[in-house]
């Protein structure tokens, strides 16, 4: 949160929002933007209409992403007090709950991606023969498929468990959702890579399903919390629970 430079200033007529947000999901197609801004000594959330005066939306550089991204610039955007979500300066707990939900959703997407990639690889390796036997019956290929299934099912179970826990305590589940997101997205990279390898040159065809999965798997380790950042938080929680508590 310390890196947020968007600010909200209270005036006699309401609020003035200034700053910018980069790589915002669905920028340009959304009707409203939920915006986090520094207000006083804390942080607040605001619901900003897309057509409000002073708000400029422009596309981000083209990147590998599952949805449209863009930049929002708030140039002295005037808002009523009623646009604030919750109490002034009390957005932190809402942010934690939102991050928890988003990270679980990314973990779920990674599980679905693994499922699709593995099904594609199994179909190919069962139908294509080499030296008189299906590829799936050759030891090296069978190992790729088996390890991928192991990654898929362990990620699926952790994601389901985390979602069930979040339903009861969304605000206190961030570390667990971070663990699910880290586990599933890292596994997705391994699984899709193995699937490409098992399919040989057929896994390298541009425009194929497996090529699409390969492209989609990589950014999952970056958005909604990069893997390296998640590891720091997870390790900190682990030390508190199992270490000396500091």
Feature map (PLM): residue ranges:
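Alpha-helical interface subdomain recognition
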Residues: 1, 10-15, 73, 97-246
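Short glycine/proline-enriched turns and hinge-like loops at secondary-structure junctions
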Residues: 1-2, 26-31, 66
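Flexible, small-/acidic-enriched active-site or ligand-binding loops
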Residues: 3, 51-80
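Beta-sandwich/jelly-roll carbohydrate-recognition scaffolds of carbohydrate-active enzymes
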Residues: 5-7
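Short beta-strand-to-turn element immediately C-terminal to the catalytic PLP-Schiff-base lysine
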Residues: 9, 35-38, 47-49, 73-75, ...
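A short core secondary-structure module
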Residues: 18-57
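Active-site PLP-lysine loop of aminotransferase-like
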Residues: 21, 63-64, 103, 181
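Long, acidic (Asp/Glu-rich), low-complexity accessory segments flanking structured domains
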Residues: 76-94
């Amino acid at each position: 949160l310390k890196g947020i430079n968007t600010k909200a200033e209270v005036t006699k007529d309401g609020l003035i929002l200034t700053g910018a947000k980069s790589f915002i999901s669905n920028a340009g197609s959304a009707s409203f933007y939920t915006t986090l801004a520094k207000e006083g000594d804390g942080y607040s959330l605001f619901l900003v209409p897309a057509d409000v005066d002073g708000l400029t939306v422009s596309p981000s550089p083209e990147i590998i992403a599952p949805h449209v991204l863009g930049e929002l610039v708030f140039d002295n955007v005037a808002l009523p007090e009623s646009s604030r979500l919750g109490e002034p300066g009390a957005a932190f707990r809402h942010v934690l709950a939102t991050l928890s939900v988003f990270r679980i959703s990314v973990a779920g997407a990674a599980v679905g991606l693994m499922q699709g990639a593995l099904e594609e690889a199994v179909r190919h390796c069962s139908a294509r023969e080499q030296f008189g036997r299906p590829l799936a019956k050759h030891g090296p290929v069978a190992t790729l498929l088996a390890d991928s299934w192991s990654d898929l099912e362990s990620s699926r179970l952790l994601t389901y468990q985390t979602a069930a826990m979040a339903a009861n305590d969304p605000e206190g589940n961030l570390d667990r959702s971070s663990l699910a997101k880290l586990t599933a997205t890292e596994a997705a990279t391994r699984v899709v890579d193995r699937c490409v390898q098992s399919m040989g040159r057929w896994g390298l065809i541009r425009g194929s399903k497996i090529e699409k999965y390969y492209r989609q798997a990589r950014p999952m380790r970056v958005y909604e919390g990069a893997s390296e950042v998640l590891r720091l938080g997870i390790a900190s929680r682990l030390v508190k629970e199992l270490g000396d508590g500091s």
